[in-house]
Design a protein with these regions (language model features):
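Active-site environment of divalent metal-dependent phosphoester hydrolases
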Residues: 11-15, 43-46, 73-77, 123, ...
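Short, well-ordered beta-strand micro-motif
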Residues: 124, 130-132, 203-207
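Divalent-metal (often Zn2+) His-rich catalytic cores of metallo-beta-lactamase-fold enzymes
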Residues: 129-130, 134-145
């Protein structure tokens, strides 16, 4: 059966993205598959601009790419459109993102801003909901607070998924870093392993025919951030 590969928070680590896409392409072996990227493409790490460029370039034939929006992506858009202070973005890791564009806000292409802003907040298949941070388990997706979808933090012992009139689904998310992760629960999988800092990225592999968590994990390693 087809599989879905999930890449969590990248935060400017183009090296990890390149390695992840190569491993996924090899693992898929020419079969159709979906790649879900959970957002937070920018800030903190050194190559925000090149991460966006790589994702915009697409993937190999037979692979479908679903690229979600994270809170750092939304903050970058808001700062560059004047909705929040640039200084606020800088304190959240935006200094490195801006540096990847040369250090001047005027040099950030509008098409990159528009692309980030256009990312969907969630992706759903028969058995799972993929989202940057999490969901309110009691509300249908159409009624979810967009800010919560990008900023929720579960208690570590919270194993809840989502079952609000649309069928029970496992929630796959990032956002809340666990360097020794991923954190796998009955109702949710948190794949964020603080990859931009540790150099350790874990890709979740999900069988589209089976409910629940990943059937396999693919680990990518690169030098940690200084």
């Amino acid at each position: 059966m087809p599989r879905t590969y999930v890449i969590p928070d990248l935060h400017g680590r183009r090296d990890l993205l390149d390695a992840a896409l190569l491993r996924i392409e090899t693992h898929a072996g020419g079969k159709e598959a979906t790649i879900v990227v959970l957002g937070d493409y920018v800030d903190k790490g050194p190559d925000s601009r090149r991460v966006i460029a790589r994702l915009r370039a697409g993937v190999a034939p037979g692979l479908r790419l679903a690229m979600l929006k994270g809170n750092h992506d939304a903050l970058m858009v808001a700062a560059l459109r004047g909705d929040v202070a640039i200084a606020n973005w800088m304190t959240k890791g935006g200094d490195t993102a801006l540096a990847s564009y040369g250090g001047d806000v005027a040099d950030v292409p509008v098409h990159d801003i528009d692309w980030l802003d256009g990312r969907p907040l969630w992706h759903m298949d028969a058995h799972r909901i993929y989202v940057h941070a999490g969901v309110d388990p009691a509300l249908p997706l159409a009624q979810q607070d967009p800010v919560l979808l990008m900023t929720k933090r579960y208690a570590d012992d919270d194993a809840s998924g989502h079952d609000a009139g649309e069928g029970a689904r496992h929630v796959v998310h990032g956002h809340d870093r666990h360097a020794d992760g991923p954190l796998l629960k009955q109702g949710r999988s948190n794949l964020d392993t603080y990859a931009w800092k540790t150099g350790r990225l874990v890709i979740g592999v999900f069988d589209d025919a089976l409910p629940g968590g990943p059937v396999e994990l693919i680990e990518i390693t690169a030098p940690p951030a200084p």
